[in-house]
Amino acid sequence: MPEEHEHNFVVSQENWSLHRKGYQDQQRHSDKVKDAIKNNLPDLVSEENIIMSNGRDVVKIPIRSLDEYKIRYNYEKSKHVGQGDGESEVGDVVARDPNASQQGQQGQGNGKKAGDQPGTDFYESEVSIAEIEEALFQELELPNLKQKDEVEITTEKIEFNDVRKKGLMGNVDKKRTILTALKRNAREGKAQITPIYNDDLRFKTWNEIIKRDSKAVVIAMMDTSASMGTFEKYMARSFFFWMNRFLRTKYDTVEFEFIAHHTEAKVVSEEDFFSKGESGGTICSSAYHKALEVIDEKFNPRSYNIYPFHFSDGENISSDNATCIDLVHEIMEKSNMFGYGEVNGYNRYSTLMNAYKNIEDPKFKHYILKEKADVYHAMKSFFHKQPEKV
């Protein structure tokens, strides 16, 4: 007597292409938003609404309108038609009057003079912090990350990397289910997909990824002296804001120490580091002494990848510069990299940068920030992603 199967499944033969129009429009809009984010990253990274909201806000960016292709009347009223000269390229406007720009009477307004032609339609789309992070963080990584004393950790991410015969219907693997049914039916002499039985069902299942990873610590040092004005402090905090989010998003075992300094340095909380201001003179070596103290007390270089970052306006007491250079070299002996960012929007003479420009150690990286967009460029400079080795 042939074995009976419970037959509860069918394969839909409906033409699903009829239902894809909305999805295609949505995907096209999503692609345009991603392009707009990528093209506006330098401005978005320094957007004050995001920095001051602690990452819980959205911003609006302009996105070019997506017009459907259609034939329309030529409002520019070109008087001639004929064969092209073969030099046209994708994106060229067809049938535009070549003399229009010379006549000075047509064209879009440029902000100084009025024009009589329609402009390009733009609309504003809200962008969340997560979308900006996705575009920014894929370009970055911790430099010179080395394998230290290993710590086994379980990542929060799960991967669907196994297939089983039992599972949740929401996780059914349609492709493998159909292949299983097709093979079984073929063995029975019927080269077709249906019928599909319970025994043919295959389900995707997941596993938590266990990996061995090295620990890292970032020592963030910021000049909070009186010479650090509103713009300088905003730029420094903007950089540290994105650095903080980047490292905590991409790495599981990164720790942070925050040091604020004027003539004296002290370890502060993350909240105080990003919110409180101080005054006084500037002795940058005080921050480096404190960083070495923190490293010696808490972070053994054999167990930690150490990344000190210092942001200042460069207005240091000249007599302190030689001490700073010696301490920077001492810190680099214990760290993977030393990053120095200087906020100098007016191209003024900087005593500290003048001293640091002679440091030739490859571990030493510096960047001068002159405008808000440089926060993005500084991030890319310090956390430049190395090409994968083939």
Swiss-Prot record:
Residues 99-121 are annotated as: Disordered. InterPro entries: Spore_YhbH, UPF0229. It comes from the Bacteria. HAMAP family: UPF0229. Belongs to the UPF0229 family. This is UPF0229 protein OB2647. It comes from Oceanobacillus iheyensis (strain DSM 14371 / CIP 107618 / JCM 11309 / KCTC 3954 / HTE831).
